[in-house]
Amino acid sequence: MDADKQLERQLEKELDEMPAEDLDDDAYDEYDLIVIPDQGKGSPQQGHSESPQQEEEHKSEELRQRSRPTWPPSSAGGDMTTIELISSDDEPSVEETEGGNAAGRGRARNDSSSSSDDVGVIEGSELESNSEVSSDSDSDSDNAGGGNQLERSYQELNALPSKKFAQMVSLIGIAFKLNDLEKIESSVLELQNLATVPAHVWLKYLKARLVVTQTDEERKAFEEQCAKALGYYYSIPLSEYVVNYLVDQGNVQNHVLWAKLLADYDVERPDFGDKLRSLISTITDENEAAAFVEMLQKHCVTWTCNVEQRQMIKSVVDKFKQHLDETTRGWDWSEQHKAHVYDVETLSLDDDLKNAVIRFIFERSVAKFPIVDVLWLSYIEFIQFEGVTVPENEDENEVTAEMVAKRAKRLGKGFLRNTELDLANRGVRSHPSVQLNHRFLDLMERSDFELAEVDEEIRLILQRIVTDMDMTVELHLDYLAYRIRNTNASDEQQVASLRAAFNHAWEELTVLYGDQADTRYEVLQLWAQVEYTQLGSPDNGREIWRQIMGYPGSSIRGLLWLNFAQMESEYNGGHGTRDVLRKALSQPVLENGLMVQEFFRRYERCYGTYESIAACQALDLPVEYVKPRSRIKPNSQSAYPRQQKLKPRQQQQQTNREPLNREQRRRQAHEQQQQQQQQQKHGIKKSRTEPSGGATSPPSKVKGPANAEAKESNFKYSPNMEINKIFVRNLHPACSKEELHELFSPFGTIKDVRLVHKLNKQFKGIAYVEFEKPGEAQRAVAGRDGCLFKGMNISVAISNPPPRGTSAVKPSVAPKRRVPTSLIPTTLVRQEVAAKKLRLLLPEPGDISSTSASVDVAIKREANGEEQKGDVQERDEQKGEEQKGEEQKGEEPKGEEQKGDDQIGEEQSGVEQKGDEKKEEEMPAAVPKSNDDFRKLFLKD
């Protein structure tokens, strides 16, 4: 016994004299969480001041740690309570929860202190900032006091019956500060029941767990924890740590751990497989090695990839990783990342390899942006493999079986193998949102979850999102809709349970948020409508509406009265509709009172009598309720900061002058009005006098990509159709010139490609491609119009640009239709049209009276701007005028009818001669066709 103590002291002395760099020389320094405490925190001599029994325990623990050469030893004379755990070196999530650090600092006792951002993800900085230890000092009392304070904080938080998310994060941080493995494990597992534990927290926990792992059973339990940690988030640091552990241990017995790990990470990290191949070569049993390789081929689809396939996968992976590194939090998945999935689908690989690469894209995306719900929803849509239409000629059963097989291949066989329900659960546990909660509830209903299971999941989500009132209300409404769909109205027990669910939801919202929760009374309105419709109890529905209208402020809201009246009218036979509307219009003030009054009048006209209609019309409309304006804060910014900056100093000086009397104000207003009129006239004259090509607009200060590219490109704007240039639209946002050149180069020689951008450097999704020959452009239109390019159906057409816009100020109203005009007087044109009509309508050469009447009518219509009528209609009008003329002739004096035949013949011949002369005068020899011809008419001598 004395020899053992002497050996321990000798080893302790050698360890104290050993340089620090020798202590840190270890293969696992990159992931090591054990740090030698500095002299300020405690010196090795502190162990001698303790009791002999504690000292002996510390030394025995120290010897046990030294007996393991693979892993770094602990500090001399220290136990597990003196090991300091630092944060991991893995890449944390980009999304940081605002106020998360403040939630963890000194808020152990404040249960109500939380914010809406508490539903965010956990960052490593939060764990480091929680429950900071007091400042370092040389005295043992300070260190002991800090430890006692942390211990008290941990006990107080752990004793809470229902912990909030922020409190659980604080609990984990305190546990890591205390360096107590049992506390760390219990706090991590407790958080695991509520939310998804991030990868960097798992990494810290595994490093602390490995320190005390020695026996085979402990190593087996440790590997089980590694497998559990790998099933939450895609994390390269975590996978590297597990792979390095297995390689250093020479562990090839855990076939499942290796196979599932490579199934998830071999796409990005083929070096993991290379390390495993070197270990497989050391297996002496050929049957065991063959079975292991067979399992790897079954799980990891990239295990047997050749060099060419690896190169194709590597190009897509590297491109996506670069894009992901450059991507910030403000992006749109459907517009930005959809092209990467399309690139994978166009590769000449089998479906298993494509699905593996696409899963990698999704897993890396949700690992970096875990709170972006659209990523989780897109991932779920990919796994579901829905939206594929069955052809008419194909057998539906065979196609369905094929789709089921393809869907099974999309799931993968690694630790991150998730169905759509598992993905929705992961997304909700990572960061709940209204869309994700709705999707998760829908998938649980499709999977035939029991009501108790659904209630438990909803309870966990509500516990997580208690700080977000709007999301909580939406989740309650989604849950109530689920209960309505799954309630049998003929079962009294289910009906009572449904009513209890409505009552519980309303009471819980009232307790949590008071009068601020569900101010539109959507829960109660839904309950009332269910009572009216599905449960067939209008009395209960009316009672719920009376409860709604009894709340403060609801009686002045006209839309609520309208909904109440409509339910009574539609589902209760209109028994209480009149009373509801009369009570609404009897309010002193009312929002949307006109809508209520109009509805009341329509109802009375449809179902009422003369007396009831008159009584309804006699009701006065209440005063419109005007919401009080919110006070402007002193530090609030104006909505028009530019206008405030551009105010002249004269207006600021005028505020200091004496107020003007009425006459001075009238004169000032008159002068301002005259100045405005003069400015408008001056602007109109200036726009009229400016030549079309003489004045040049000032150069724009904004130099966007469109301007820069216009200088670089050889394109020239043409207002006419360009038969050798094509116009392409509906392109994906990340489109480049090289991609378009590659797309259209098979149809001919491309001279230039131009992408059109906005001034804010945003791509419009359109481009111009110019070919050398028109035939090449025609072939490009025929070959590429409507084709699928990077996930988008593009449209290709011959370029026919509209007239180029000018820098003039556009009118605020729609511009009038412009018609091409010339300098030829419209009278001559009308005469030409009338002459043509004369030739067409002339039935006989001698019928002068009818033709002259038709010419007059035609000229009159043209002069008034009326539309030209058809030939049949004109003939009918002409006959009517001839009949009127004959009737007028019958009323003339008889003396005129008794004229001689000779005199009548002379008059008719004179009329014919005059008509011929008039016809020759009205029809010129040559109608001017242009401005030059028109000038020649007036330049003749």
UniProtKB/Swiss-Prot annotation:
Outcome recorded upon mutating residue 139 to G: In RNA edited version
GO biological process terms held by the UniProt record: central nervous system development; mRNA splicing, via spliceosome
GO MF term set: mRNA binding
Effect of substituting residue 383 to V: In RNA edited version
Listed result of changing residue 493 to R: In RNA edited version
Annotated phenotype, changing residue 510 to A: In RNA edited version
The protein's role, per its UniProt record: May be involved in gene regulation during development. Binds RNA.
Name assigned to this protein: RNA-binding protein 4F
Annotated source species: Drosophila melanogaster (Fruit fly)
